[in-house]
Amino acid sequence: MASSSRPKTDVLVGGRYKLVREIGFGSFGHVYLAIDLTNHEQVAVKLESENTRQPRLLHEKELYNFLQGGVGIPQIRWYGQETDYNVLVMDLLGPSLEDLFNFCSRRFSMKTVLMLADQMISRIEYVHSRNLIHRDIKPDNFLMGTGPQWKKLFLVDFGLAKKYRDNRTGQHIPHRSGKSFIGTPFCASISAHLGIEQSRRDDMESIGYVLMYFNRGSLPWQGLKAATLKQKCEKISEMKMTTPVDVLCKGFPIEFAMYLKYCLRLSFEEAPDYRYLRQLFRLLFRKLSYQHDYAFDWIVLKQKAEQQASSSSGEGQQAQTPTGKSDNTKSEMKHS
């Protein structure tokens, strides 16, 4: 591979993965769609410069390996070095929930939000069961599967993840303050903003903010202006702390406020009651007489587009929509 800040396409990594095109970019580096030449499968290739100031790819690879076998955890195909890059090859997944939210005009139906909530809680429960916390829960880091796994939600990007408990002794990490902020400001927990060591409760609180983001279309602290990122984080933190949960969740079923209030009451080392939280939303789902048929909003929109195309042209045409059923061009590595 040629050494440059932007890797070239049409080259091999790991002796078998041919880069096709770039499909993502972030502070971590580049993400490419690639073809496995041994079986012609599409995969995602994440590239990180060996000269990066804060290398994270090896750490992320080790955590993915540690989590292998869990539902909604992408499979690692290969890790190694090519010229000036650390390389991670993994399953190619579908679009992120942020992509799909934009496709759906930045509003999800209650049915879609509740079906997603169930899977989101289960994904983070598994991660916590492996003594890890994610610390960057946000819509970009939940991706839908493709092909036979089109209805399955995947949790990705473990570059900021951390052990909260020792695997051997079971000892929980100590409560600390004065920590640097870690995460994404609009979804981060209040404790993360305050510099308090994160634990399981913080991941759960972040899920609550993501759900309300999907319900409302935006959160009250989004779009705040500030001269620096630090000042913006401070403004977001202040607004989060001064916005009552009941105000944030006003106009939506009480279960969302109940969820967030429960998470905010958790103590630092306390294990969340994942079953209780899932049940909150499952009971609401049944109360609203929804059918758990995986008819997510983007699937319904795609079907309508296909029907319109068919009726206007006289033949079925596949709509160009970012659904997990047919789009294989989005990588696991969408990151903002």
Curated annotation (Swiss-Prot):
GO molecular function: ATP binding; protein serine kinase activity; protein serine/threonine kinase activity
Annotated ranges, domain Protein kinase: 17-285
Pfam families reported in the protein's UniProt record: Pkinase
Subcellular locations according to the entry: Cytoplasm
Biased composition, class Basic and acidic residues, residue ranges: 327-336
GO CC, alphabetical: cytoplasm; Golgi membrane; nucleus
Top EC class for this record: transferase
Superkingdom of the source species: Eukaryota
Any single biological process term in GO: Wnt signaling pathway
Keyword annotations: ATP-binding, Cytoplasm, Kinase, Nucleotide-binding, Serine/threonine-protein kinase, Transferase, Wnt signaling pathway
Name of this protein: Casein kinase I isoform beta
Organism: Bos taurus (Bovine)
